[in-house]
Amino acid sequence: MNLIKLFIICCLLISITVKSFEIENDIDIDFEFDNSFDQSSSSAGSGSDSYDQDKCKGKPNPYPIFNKEPIFIASTANGKLYKTGDDSNQVSILHLYGEAYEMGYAHGTLLKEQVNELIPKFMEFAEIAIKEFIKTKFALRLPEFLIKLIEEFGVNAALDYVASATEQFTPKRFFNELLGLSDSSGIPYQTLLRMHMFPELVKATCSIVGAWSEATINGGLLQVRALDWGLENPLVNYPTLIVYHPQENDGGEFSILSWTSFIGALTGYSQRTGVCEKVWLSYNGTYTHNGMPFYFILRDILQYDNSIYEALNRIYNTPRTCAVYLGVGSNESNTASLLEVSMDVVRVFDDETPFPGFAPPVPEHPLFKDVVYVDKHSQPSTDPCMANSLSQSWSEITAQTLINTMGQMETGDLHSAVYDFKQNLVYVSVATTNIPFPFTNETLPLVSPAYKNQFIQFNMTKLFSEQPPLPPPNNSSSSDSNSNSNSDSSSSSDSNSNSN
């Protein structure tokens, strides 16, 4: 990989003209980055009077919480698969056990069909999305040589460069997990690796809230993660809650709300800690890819850290890449913190710290006792919606009031989550899942954003205590044989013992 990196840079320096590879595709996407990948230039974020100062643009979520037991689908060596949610809002629940390679192998076995559907669609989408992205003002976040690399050599070359630059800083277990996923699904390892570099190039606008103690109705910690990454992408059809059950002495159980085949943590909860992320659009410092991708740092926080102090120590001492806001909550302290994180900066904000950048807060972002928050716009935001909603429910904040805040703010289009640390519950909503991508002019209006859909309750005590699958009756030594036979048709005894 280092030779690839050196070759690419040398080619750019001597200005060799190479025609970039153009893929054939039938996906027609109208990319409006202000309304999908980046929403910083929305009218609310620019100080427009389109918002009434006492009202929000959206509405509270109208649906009751979906709390039916998950439905068992299949099991294999080191993995179990369930599903939950109604027909238009379904989420897969994937339990993984064992070492990293074994977890990846189980992932690719149980979701082989979905992986082989999603990856080609996503890589085609990524080619279009990144080329469109570098035409926008937000491409200024990328190093100039990387933009030139994309223009001259294509998107895959840029993804390969990022993979090469981050490799030495990334623990091998992540690569081993991808290798297992590749071996069982049949998707080339390099393709899976490229997919995992996409968030290093194109970030999402999101919202983060932490509320605790006097701000919440029961004094417990609640945390919001609203992911705004647009609806015109194939991830919409493949939401997956991945529950990891590491081996003894390798951290604790944790979960990530993700998609089939993506193992990084953009949204995650372990009861010990909860994490979330948002792009730091106003950052004007140094960029680098010589570090560990933020979504792998967040996953390590979930697996290994028990407090905000431990999470901060990890972030401080890990080489970092891009500029993001992070939200970290901790059951140990019953508090949450916001962070500004980049290659050369780590700033920590609590409920008494002026945000962003330690500057005096704008009127639309007042400080609240026992609350930290940042909305989906470029910061400092002049949209009063989130502050108004939080102030109205302060001292009586619940998971439901935060769900309503997301609806009022219209944030969390791809997925939305509320972590309830005291009850050990997670509430999740995803965008409409039963309209197949690519969307047409007729079908796109049918795709509803997550914040408008029904939220699903996940009992994390049950999920984290889920027992591993039963061994196959014949005790075969062949992992391939075990995986294939169990995933295609699980025995009735296995189904009965694993159903909830």
From Swiss-Prot:
Residues 464-500 are annotated as: Disordered. The keyword Cell membrane does not apply. Keywords: Glycoprotein, Secreted, Signal. It is found in: Secreted. GO terms for cellular component: extracellular region. The keyword Secreted applies. This is Protein dcd1B. The lineage of its organism: Eukaryota, Amoebozoa, Evosea, Eumycetozoa, Dictyostelia. The gene is dcd1B.
